[in-house]
Amino acid sequence: EVERKHPLGGSRPGRCPTVPPGTFGHCACLCTGDASEPKGQKCCSN
């Protein structure tokens, strides 16, 4: 896991999952920061 800060702000404790080596993650920004997510969830972008 890697701690990442979303470019649009918001930072909750926790870590975003890593993308396994040799693979590509689905790159979609569907949130605007941790504050836009339900309580206890993080906004992660790979």
Curated annotation (Swiss-Prot):
**Superkingdom of origin:** Eukaryota
Asked if Cytoplasm is a keyword of the record, the answer is: no
A GO MF annotation of the entry reads: serine-type endopeptidase inhibitor activity
> What UniProt keywords are attached to this protein's entry?
Antibiotic, Antimicrobial, Protease inhibitor
The protein's matches in InterPro entries, at most eight in alphabetical order, are given as: Elafin-like_sf (IPR036645)
GO cellular component term of the entry, any? extracellular space
Residue limits of the WAP domain? 12-46
Single GO BP term: antibacterial humoral response
Q: What does this protein do?
A: Has antibiotic activity against several equine uterine pathogens; S.zooepidemicus, E.coli and P.aeruginosa. Highly efficient against S.zoopedemicus. Not active against K.pneumoniae. Selectively inactivates microbial serine proteases (subtilisin A and proteinase K) without inhibiting mammalian serine proteases (human neutrophil elastase, human cathepsin G and bovine pancreatic trypsin).
User: Can you say what this protein is called?
Assistant: Antimicrobial peptide eNAP-2
